[in-house]
C-alpha cells in the first residue's frame, strides 16, 4: 500500500502494479497474464514482457504537478546518462530484456491460473538529493520570507516525504511537507492570508503551495507558539517536535500544561541539551521522539549541503 515515501499504483483492471520507493530508491513493476489453454509459455512470456515494458515506461514518465516526470534524472541508462521521456521506451525494453525478470505462477480468486512477471530497478544513488535540488530555490525563498532555518525545512521534507511531491499518508496528509487540510494547512493558511480556508488535496499537491504553507507553519510554531523561548536551538527542538505532534503536546511534555507561556518559562530555565533530553525521552509518542532525532541529524547534513 502507498505511504508518503512509497507510491503504489494499480491499473484499472488490477492486472498491473507499480511501486516507487522514494526512500530506498527502488522501482518495482509487476504484471499478471492470464494462462489460457493453448497458450505456450513462450507466448505468455512475450505477453508478460510487453506488458512490463509498458508499465515501466508509464512509471518513468509519470508527471509531477509541474509536468516534469517525478523521476526526472533519477534513473541511469547504464551508460552515464539519465532517462528522459523520449528514451524511456528503449530503456524499458532493455531493462526487461537484461534484468532478472521474476516469474511466478499464481491462482487468482476466480480460480484461473495466471502468471505474474515482475522486475525491480534501482534509482541513482543520489536520487533524494536530485529531488531536493528541484525544490531548492523555492524552499530557500520561503525560508527567507518566513525567517526560518532552511536546513530544518529540507530535513523535515526529507523525513516527511523523501521529496516525493505526490506523497499521501493514511491520515490523509498531502504533498512534500505532508500537510493535513484540517490542521497544519489550515493553521498556516490563516497565518499568511488572515482567513480560514479548508484546502483541497489538489491544492496541497502543488509544490509551491505546499512549501509556502509548510514553511509558514514552521514559522508559526517557531515565532508564535514557541516565540517566548529565548534560545534559538531550544525553540527549534520544540518546533520540530511540534511539526509532528502539535504544539499542545510539546507544551504538555515541558510544563504539564498546554499553556504556551508556562511552556516558554519551563524551557527558558534549561539548556538546549536538557530540552533535547526531555523531549527525546518524554514526548507522548515514540514516533515524535524518533522524528526529532531524525530531523536534527538530517538538518546537519543539509546545513553543510547548502554551503556546497
Segments the model singles out, each with a brief description of its role:
Residues 1-158, 223, 227-229, 256-308:
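Cell-wall glycan-active module
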Residues 36, 161-164, 182-186, 245-250:
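Solvent-exposed loop/turn segments at secondary-structure junctions
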Residues 147-168, 179-180, 214, 239-244, ...:
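Short, functionally critical alpha-helical segments immediately adjacent to catalytic or ligand/cofactor-binding
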Residues 166-169, 189, 252-256:
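Short, solvent-exposed loop/turn and secondary-structure capping segments
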Residues 169-172, 236, 288:
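Active-site-proximal structural scaffolding
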Residues 170-197, 212-220, 268-270, 295:
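Substrate-binding/active-site groove segments that recognize
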Residues 195-209:
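A short, structured beta-strand-centered segment in the mid-to-C-terminal lobe
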Residues 210-259:
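Catalytic and binding regions of secreted/periplasmic enzymes and modules that target cell-wall glycans
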Amino acid at each position: 500500500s502507498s505511504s508518503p515515501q512509497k507510491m503504489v499504483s494499480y491499473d484499472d483492471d488490477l492486472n498491473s502494479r507499480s511501486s516507487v520507493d522514494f526512500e530506498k530508491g527502488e522501482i518495482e513493476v509487476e504484471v499478471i497474464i492470464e494462462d489460457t489453454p493453448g497458450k505456450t509459455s513462450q507466448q505468455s512470456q512475450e505477453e508478460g514482457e510487453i506488458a512490463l515494458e509498458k508499465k515501466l515506461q508509464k512509471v518513468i514518465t509519470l508527471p509531477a504537478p509541474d509536468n516534469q516526470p517525478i523521476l526526472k534524472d533519477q534513473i541511469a541508462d547504464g551508460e552515464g546518462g539519465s532517462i528522459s521521456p523520449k528514451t524511456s521506451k528503449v530503456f524499458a525494453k532493455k531493462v526487461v530484456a537484461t534484468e532478472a525478470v521474476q516469474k511466478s505462477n499464481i491462482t487468482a480468486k476466480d480460480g484461473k491460473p495466471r502468471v505474474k512477471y515482475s522486475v525491480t530497478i534501482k534509482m541513482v544513488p543520489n536520487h533524494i538529493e536530485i529531488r531536493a535540488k528541484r525544490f531548492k530555490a523555492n524552499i530557500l525563498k520561503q525560508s527567507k520570507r518566513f525567517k526560518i532555518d532552511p536546513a530544518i525545512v529540507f530535513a523535515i521534507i526529507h523525513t516527511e516525504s523523501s521529496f516525493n511531491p505526490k506523497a499521501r499518508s493514511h491520515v490523509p496528509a498531502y504533498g512534500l511537507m505532508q500537510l493535513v487540510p484540517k490542521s497544519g494547512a489550515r493553521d498556516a493558511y490563516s497565518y499568511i492570508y488572515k482567513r480560514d480556508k479548508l484546502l483541497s488535496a489538489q491544492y496541497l499537491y502543488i509544490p509551491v503551495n505546499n512549501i509556502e504553507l509548510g514553511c509558514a507553519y514552521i514559522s508559526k510554531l517557531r515565532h508564535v507558539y514557541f516565540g517566548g523561548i529565548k534560545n534559538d536551538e531550544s525553540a527549534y527542538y520544540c518546533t520540530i517536535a511540534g511539526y509532528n505532534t502539535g504544539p499542545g503536546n510539546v507544551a504538555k511534555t515541558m510544563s504539564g500544561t498546554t499553556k504556551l507561556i508556562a511552556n516558554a518559562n519551563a524551557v527558558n530555565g534549561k539548556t538546549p541539551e536538557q530540552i533535547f533530553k526531555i523531549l527525546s525521552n518524554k514526548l507522548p509518542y515514540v514516533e515524535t521522539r524518533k522524528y526529532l532525532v531524525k530531523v536534527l541529524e538530517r538538518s546537519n547534513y543539509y546545513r553543510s549541503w547548502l554551503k556546497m
